[in-house]
Design a protein with these regions (language model features):
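Membrane-embedded beta-barrel scaffold of Gram-negative outer-membrane proteins
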Residues: 136-161, 362-364, 379, 388-485, ...
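Outer-membrane beta-barrel channels and translocator barrels
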Residues: 21-22, 33, 64-68, 141-142, ...
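Outer-membrane beta-barrel domain signature, strongest for Gram-negative TonB-dependent receptors
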Residues: 46, 52-199, 205-211
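Gram-negative outer-membrane beta-barrel transporters
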Residues: 189, 197-199, 203-205, 280, ...
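Outer-membrane beta-barrel translocator/receptor signature
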Residues: 1-41, 47-57, 69, 129-133, ...
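Transmembrane beta-strands of outer-membrane beta-barrel pores
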Residues: 2-8, 32-36, 77-81, 141, ...
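Solvent-exposed loop segments that connect transmembrane elements
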Residues: 39-48, 85-118, 164-171, 214-258, ...
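Transmembrane beta-strands of outer-membrane beta-barrel proteins
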Residues: 26-30, 71-73, 146-148, 197-202, ...
Length: 559
């Protein structure tokens, strides 16, 4: 099979099916895809941002040793090299201007020529090699079916991002992941056609994940992000009456904020589900199920940053006395080495009732409890490293022989700095951990078959109550995206779909969905110096991001 489309999109694939005997058959194939890209990067001579190449192959074999035993094997590998991340500049946001005014500052647009343009100087890309393999063994006894599914996955990938997404040479990240995952599921279930349909199973999963993600601050980034931010803080201090004048100079041409992380995950589950058909009356069925989930997540982290070589000047006028102190040869290291772990135990029930009055005509209602795993934000270590670097720089100043340890003014300077530029405490666990997400889901609907089996209709209404909802957002420093928990949200809506066979050759389909998803308890507060908390953002009643309010699909098929 070969195909082509606009914007230099091409694909080719080859598949072979072969049956060697009544007991064994297999299929194998390969593919290659090229995408020319659509979005252009103005900072790289209008280079296509999203061009990509991908290729791979697969094998599947089915072996029947006997009439009641089947072995299904699958193996696939895919390699892809993609451009991406077509983020364009929208200009300074009104909220940023308002926040600056609150802090007594004024923000002006200095990149007006780049508004609406994708413009960053380093090529951003994602490269991945993915191997999947699995074996499904199924044994059919007289009264039950026993199946065992074993899976293995190997992932090697590399993500490179120009993280400032501008034409300036500020900073970038190269994140690499190496993951090995093995899973096993054993299911014992009733054979079809029985009044009592039941299934009991056990599931186990273990993943080894090794991640490296150094952030490289280039010369402009060292100046604008490290040096200028520090001096801005000193300027705020110096603006106070009687305060000293302070200034910092960073000598590093570049600065690497690195990290190596091992985040293994262990998961296991036991579950059972029973469906009682024709309960009390013909066509009425009731389903009840329960799943016990256990999950243990851990993280071993080793985050090391290039020591900052910096100088510091301190000037203070105290009556007739002029204090002028300086040290241009200080070093400030920053590192985090340690481990974290946590585990969760969950009970996830399921209830359903259905009434079917004719084949493929029914009404139903379901209630389920949902759960999404928690985890660790390893990209938060870039923010933590910046905070630790600032703390380390303050400590270096305090320990400097010519400043903090000055025989005459050292103690005075240390006391002043402790009051004006206090060290920030760092809680690695609180800063990097996000909690699981929980939900209760309710749905009622109907499946209808009409027009002598030529028209199918599906309608449903749903309601979802979510707690500790997980959201993706940029870290405060801009160094990567993180997952946060956002209190509570509520979603409700309806869906409808129609599919019609107009003739033997022609079928038409249309579907529509409406979802109203809003936060019900999501308020962000910030602790003030006096210990009180100030509301900085109130999202109650606001829409949950990335949940479309309306979806519509219209299609047809002629064959």
């Amino acid at each position: 099979r070969m195909g082509a489309a606009t914007y230099n999109n091409y694909n080719v694939s080859l598949t072979h099916y072969h049956r060697t005997s009544d007991r064994f058959a297999f299929s194998t194939g390969g593919f290659y895809e090229h995408t020319g890209g659509f979005f252009e990067n103005s900072a790289r001579n209008n280079e296509k941002v999203d061009k990509s190449n991908a290729g791979g192959g697969r094998f599947r074999g089915i072996y029947l040793p006997s009439s009641n035993l089947k072995i299904d094997m699958a193996l696939s590998y895919e390699y892809s090299d993609q451009g991406g991340y077509p983020y364009y500049y929208t200009g300074i946001t009104p909220s940023a201007i308002a926040k600056a005014k609150e802090n007594g500052k004024e923000m002006t647009e200095d990149r007006a020529d780049y508004i609406g343009k994708i413009s960053y100087n380093d090529r951003s890309s994602y490269r991945r090699g993915l191997l999947n393999s699995g074996v499904n063994i199924e044994y059919q006894a007289n009264n039950f079916i026993l199946s065992a599914v074993t899976g293995y996955q190997n992932l090697n990938d590399r993500m490179f991002l120009d993280q400032d997404f501008t034409e300036r040479d500020i900073f970038n990240i190269e994140q690499k992941q190496r993951a090995n995952t093995i899973s096993e599921e054993i299911v014992l279930k009733a054979k079809p056609g029985k009044r009592w349909q039941w299934a009991t199973g056990a599931f186990g999963f273990y993943q080894w994940l090794h991640t490296t993600g150094p952030v490289l601050f280039k010369e402009e980034g060292v100046k604008s992000v490290i040096e200028n931010n520090a001096n801005s803080a000193f300027e705020e201090v110096s603006a106070k009456p009687g305060a000293p004048t302070m200034g910092m100079t960073v000598h590093n041409p570049t600065l690497s904020v690195g990290g190596t992380f091992d985040t293994p995950t262990l998961s296991g589950a036991l579950y059972h589900q029973s469906t009682f058909n024709n309960l009390f009356i013909e066509g009425l069925s009731v389903t009840a199920g329960l799943r016990l989930d256990y999950e243990k997540i851990s993280m071993k982290y080793n985050s090391l940053s290039t020591p900052i070589d910096f100088g510091f000047d301190f000037h203070l006028a105290m009556g007739p006395n002029q204090i002028n102190l300086s040290d241009q040869n200080m070093k400030a290291p920053a590192s985090f080495v340690g481990k974290l772990s946590t585990d969760y135990v969950q009970l996830l029930p399921k209830f359903a009732i259905q009434y079917e009055w004719k084949n493929q005509n029914n009404v139903y209602a379901t209630v389920t409890r949902g759960y999404r795993s928690g985890g660790y934000n390893i990209q938060m270590f870039s923010d933590l490293s910046q905070t630790e670097l600032k703390n380390s720089m303050m400590n270096a100043i305090k320990e400097s022989p010519t400043i903090g340890q000055d025989a005459t003014w050292g103690k005075t300077i240390i006391n002043m700095m402790n009051q004006m530029v206090p060290a920030k405490e760092i809680d690695v666990k609180a800063s990097t951990t996000y909690k699981p997400e929980y939900s209760w889901n309710y749905e009622a609907g109907s499946h209808l078959t009409l027009w002598e089996g030529r028209l199918w209709a599906d309608v449903a209404a749903f309601y979802m109550d979510t707690r500790d909802q997980q959201l993706s957002q940029f870290a405060e420093s801009g160094l990567g995206r993180i997952t946060i928990n956002a209190g509570k949200s509520r979603s409700y809506g309806a869906e409808a779909a129609l599919r019609a066979s107009v003739t033997k050759e022609l079928s038409l389909n249309v579907s529509y969905g409406y979802t109203y998803a809003t936060f019900t308890d999501y308020v962000i507060t910030e602790e003030q110096k006096d210990g009180t908390f100030k509301v900085t953002a109130d999202y109650n009643g606001k829409y949950v991001p990335f949940v479309p309010k309306h979806t519509l699909n219209i299609g047809g098929e002629y064959a």
